[in-house]
Structure formats: structure tokens, C-alpha cells
Amino acid sequence: MNKLIELRRAKRLALSLLLIAAATFVVTLFLPPNFWVSGVKAIAEAAMVGALADWFAVVALFRRVPIPIISRHTAIIPRNKDRIGENLGQFVQEKFLDTQSLVALIRRHEPALLIGNWFSQPENARRVGQHLLQIMSGFLELTDDARIQRLLKRAVHRAIDKVDLSGTSALMLESMTKNDRHQVLLDTLIAQLIALLQRDKSRKFIAQQIVRWLESEHPLKAKILPTEWLGEHSAELVSDAVNSLLDDISRDRAHQIRHAFDRATFALIDKLKNDPEMAARADAVKSYLKEDEAFNRYLSELWGDLREWLKVDINSEDSRVKERIARAGQWFGETLIADDALRASLNGHLEQAAHRVAPEFSAFLTRHISDTVKSWDARDMSRQIELNIGKDLQFIRVNGTLVGGCIGLILYLLSQLPALFPLGNF
């Protein structure tokens, strides 16, 4: 029901009781006085007094009552609007937003567990995914492709400029030499080469290259000699010789080729670290990347391809992005529930945030409440308050009428005690 209608109905009820009390009082004035008539008259009188007193109290809150002397104590809410705003802001600051109250609230409710329980529900995780997809969809519709492409290109170029290519390469190689991991890499390479040379296709390829070399460099001998037979047997000899060498390197941890590989690796690391020529080559590679048309065209097309893929995925019923977000949210919730230390850490961070933020935030909110109330029109504010709590205030008038009538009855009965029980009879 509309608040205005409820307020008017409550006012009519309170006024009706006042009019009934007044009418009853007037009627008793014209009736012959007796015990009952005088009693009804006393009840009506007291009811009118209670109704009028509470009417004045309620009306004085919102409007000025033009009664000499006491009129300056009426229209309490409009007159004290600014003070009400300041006191309301101060009340909220002291009772709800002080640091200790917020910390106690965090400790009492353990928000990390509440968050975990909420996210662990698949329906809630999917809801988060759906909302994020809507935000993402709106972002994709509003973005300027040309600007995004330029931004992406500048970001990649800046990242390339910041990379110390020679230093990073040296660091990576140096990390590979720890615990002889580079020798493990060499072992893997040797094993792959041995397996490759043992294949028939590899031997046929070597034989073909030998035959081609003979035909190219020694065409006369190639016509006289059985080139195919020579190629096949030479391929076998080459493969067996290389396999034997690789097998020796693989078995002998102190093989001279391993030492040569060590020296070459450490020499390359030293060059990457200290050789200006190597640094210049690295810078040249970076410049080439930034100026290469194919690379820059790829960067420009990357955003468009990503944007189209996202739009198609977002609009599909079985969106993979939505599913991933939902899974991530559910995993986050389940992790919070299962990990006591993580929850304690998160709650601790929230408490620290409350200590840092609460004073400034509460002061800001206090000023905001006070300034907002001060900016309101006094009469409009009074009407809004009356509209929201006026119905209950009208029942104060109703209760004043009823309580006044009851008090009038009690006082009348007390006044009749001497007549009912004369002292001379005792």
C-alpha cells in the first residue's frame, strides 16, 4: 500500500477518536448529572486532553504551531535539519564505522569463510561468470579497435626495449650449466642422433647425397664405378662411424668432445655477458623485430582475431570463457574452505585494511551524510520523514486518546470514593 495513503488513514483514525471524545463531552453537558454521566464526561475530557497533547507533540515535530511562547519549540525537524545531519553522521561513525567495530565484525563473521562458501556453490560461480561475460561483452562493444591495436603494438615494443636479450640469454644458459644440466641436454641430443642414424630413411638419404656428390664432383668415375653400391656402403660406414663416436661420447663422461662442449658453452655465456659486439647483435635483433612488417602486422591482427573469438565464445551457450571463470571461482571457494591458513591470512589482511581505511572512510562518510542532509530542502525533508514514520506517530495520538480516557476513568473513580465510602461510617 502507498505510504501516503497509509499515513492519511492513520490520521483519520486519530482524528476520529478525538472527534468522538469531543462529541461525547458535548453531549454529557446537556444530560442530567449522575454517576454514569459524570463518569463518561470525565473519560471524554481526559481523552480530549490526551489526544490534543499528543497531536501537538506530533505536529510540532514537522510544522510550526502558531501558539505564543511555545511556537519557537515547534517545527523541530525543519529547524534542526543541519544539526540532525551532523548528529546522524557522528552516530554512524561512532557506532558502525569505528575501527574496533569493523575488526570485531570481521572476527565474528569470518568473511573469508563466507566468501569461500558462496563461491563453492556451482550456481554462484556460474553467476559470477555470467556477470563477467556481460561486462566483457560491453567492453568489446565500446572499444576502439584502432586504438587497442596501437596500444598493443606500443606495449609489445616497450616490452622488447626493456628486454636485455644478451643478458637474458646468458642467464638462461648459465642456469642450464648448473648441476651439468647442459650435459644432460647433450645426452638427449646424442640419443636422438643415434636413433635418427639407425633409421633406413636416414641411411638412404646419406647414400643419395654421396651418389649426388660423386655425380657432381667426379662424373667420369660415377659412370665407371657402381655408384649406388658405393653410396649404400658408404652410408653404412658413415652411419656406423658416427654412431660409434656418439656412443663413445654418451658412455664417457670425460670425453674430449664433452670438454669442448663445456668450453664452447661457457665461452658463449661470457660473450653474451661481456662482448659489446654480441650486445649490439642482440639490439639489432630487437630493432628488426620492431621494424619487421610481418611481425607488426601480426600484432595488429592479433587483437582483431582475439576480439572476434571472444565475441563468438561469449554469445555461445557453451562458452569456454564462462566455464573457465566458473571453474576458477568454484576452485577459489573450495580452496578457501579447505585451507585454514589461507582463510586466516585473508581475514588478517581484511583486519589490517580496516585499521588503515576505517578512520578515513568513516570521516568521509560522516561528512557525506552531514553535507547531504544540509543540502536537502527543510520542508521536503520533513515531509519525507513524516511519510516514512508518520503512520507510527499517528498511533501515538490514538494511544494518547485511549490512555487519557483510561486515566480520566481512574481519576473519576478515585474522586467518587468519599461519596461511596463516607468517613463517618467508619
Curated annotation (Swiss-Prot):
Report the subcellular localization: Cell membrane
Task: List the keywords (alphabetical).
Answer: Cell membrane, Membrane, Transmembrane, Transmembrane helix
Please give the start and end residues of each transmembrane region: 13-33, 42-62, 403-423
At the top level, the lineage of the source is Bacteria
Please tell me whether the keyword Transport is annotated for this protein.
Answer: no
Can you supply one Gene Ontology CC term for this chain's record? plasma membrane
Bilayer topology term: Multi-pass membrane protein
Pfam families, sorted:
DUF445
Question: Which PANTHER family does this chain map to?
Answer: INNER MEMBRANE PROTEIN, INNER MEMBRANE PROTEIN-RELATED
Protein name as catalogued: Uncharacterized protein YjiN
Q: What organism, scientifically named, is this protein from?
A: Escherichia coli (strain K12)
